[in-house]
Amino acid sequence: LNGLTGNNSEPFLDLWMGEEAKPEDFTRVYEEKEERIYTGACRHDLEHGCYVAGEDRGVFNVEDGTLLMGNLQAESYFAPNREQLKEWLKVKPEFDSYEYTRDNLCVLNLRGGEYASEPALFLRKKYWTDAMAQMKKIRSDMEFMIVTDDVTMAHKLLPGIPAYHFPVHGDYVTVKNARYLIISNSSFACFPAFTSETVQKVIAPKYWARHNVSNGYWASEQNIYTGFEYLGRDGKLYDAQACREELETYRGQNEFFAKHHEKPDGMAYRLGEIQAKAAYTAYFGGRAVRSLKRRLTGQQK
């Protein structure tokens, strides 16, 4: 996050970036440990592997003058400084807004754009409707609005729900100051939700970036955060501790996970290609059918 407004003119976060560091100031580089599994869930996971890594304890032992590289989203890296983070990531008063902070309003942070072309990644309509049903259990008069980078896709996926794409500071503060949040598997919402002073409930997709296809693995394990509730494909909610315990059991007992750490070749790779192609065909075929139905419905009106 660069903390800029929509026109990249002025930082909206009152964020001290530290003293300027020059290349010669770094005497070593530490790359956070990676872990990937290779599956036919999508072309990316077959070719490059799906990133599933959790925390790397080595991050806590780097020396001064080290350039730290990695995903670096694990809760353990920043949770001890949560209250300080709220100060470090404080929004300047002139950019802050509580216009959409209401006791009966839930904000959906929907990620579209390039996500929408990946069936393993783009969250299905069922995730959002199941999550909204959970929020309705809290208040029967709960209303919903969408904050998104892709208003067109939001209208197609969830017609009838108001959708907005504000300048980046507007999207950020709307998420940060919401009472109730349903977020996507995008890191954009993580820090505003994690540092929020107003939020009462956050629902996120179980298995994060592989909510649609996972048989128990997380993409990645770094995205399990205390205080978030994770919605499974079964429509049920799981707290962070339950997710961690389930993951530990999965890692210890699941043969699929143990056998997919190496990129496949030969027949195994070709079978993966067939699986991925079938997933894309079904996904885009379904989108085409739904688009045709919308057009026909519009003509009938």
Question: Predicted segments — roles?
Answer:
Residues 1, 66, 104-106, 142-144, ...:
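Hydrophobic beta-strand segments of well-ordered beta-sheets in folded domains
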Residues 7-139, 240-296:
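Secretory-pathway luminal glycosyltransferase catalytic domains
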